[in-house]
Design a protein with these regions (language model features):
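Conserved SAM-binding motif I beta-strand of class I
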Residues: 38-43
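C-terminal catalytic and target-recognition region of SAM-dependent MTase-like enzymes
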Residues: 86, 113, 127-183
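Short helix-capping segments at alpha-helix termini
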Residues: 35, 57-63, 151-157
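Mobile active-site "lid"/loop adjacent to the S-adenosyl-L-methionine
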Residues: 48, 87-117, 123
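S-adenosyl-L-methionine
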Residues: 47-91
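Glycine-rich adenosyl-nucleotide cofactor-binding module
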Residues: 1-36
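A generic alpha-to-beta junction signature in SAM-dependent methyltransferases
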Residues: 12, 60, 84, 121-123
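A short helix->loop->beta-strand "cap" motif at the edges of active sites that frequently abuts
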Residues: 36-37, 123-126
Length: 183
């Protein structure tokens, strides 16, 4: 995800950022180092949130100037929405929702629900960074969850960039599942 961290850093200058499924805060750190005004980092694992805080400090950033929450991402997004808060950039990069091909229908429903919640807290004119690391979710189906979420909310969205895994993770044309990362 290093190329995606670079992109987030480039887009984040002057923005408020919310990052869910953040793990140790790679995207959060990229946004903060890129000049985000405030970054909220959410992951359900307290140990991951503590690591994210340490990563901010190790990179010369004051963790107290940002928000770190060990919480369920869906629950946190619902609370943010209920409070009427919005962010200029919202990042959602969950663990694989489709560990098997059989899980694809449930995974697509989960992505749609996640994307709808995320879109509800994106400020007008803001950015949603949505990622999937599941090899069982085709790119077109993943993009379809964004289209469905936007339609449910009667919001217009457009794609600025589509990224995949970097050159050091090549895939074979005959094995489309090898192109697992969509962002």
């Amino acid at each position: 995800q290093r190329e995606n961290r670079r992109l987030i850093g480039r887009y984040a200058a002057g923005l408020s950022v919310w990052n869910g499924f953040a793990y140790t805060g790679g995207f959060s750190l990229a946004a903060a180092l890129g000049g985000a005004t405030r970054v909220v980092t959410v992951d359900r694992a307290p140990v991951a949130i503590e690591a994210a805080r340490r990563n901010f400090a190790l990179n010369g950033l004051d963790p107290q100037a940002h928000g770190f929450f060990a919480d369920d991402v869906f629950t946190h997004l619902e609370a943010v929405r209920a409070q009427g808060l919005t962010y200029d950039m919202v990042i959602v990069d969950p663990p694989s929702f489709a560990p098997t091909a059989k899980a694809l229908p449930a995974a697509l429903a989960a992505y749609r629900d996640l994307h709808r919640l995320a879109m509800e807290v994106v400020a007008p004119g803001g950015l949603l960074v949505a990622a999937s690391c599941s090899s069982h979710v085709p790119e077109t189906a993943f993009l379809g969850t964004l289209v469905e979420a936007a339609a449910e909310l009667k919001r217009r969205c457009r794609v600025l960039e589509i990224q995949s895994q970097p050159a050091d993770h090549p895939h074979l044309p005959a094995f489309p599942e090898g192109r697992y990362l969509k962002c």
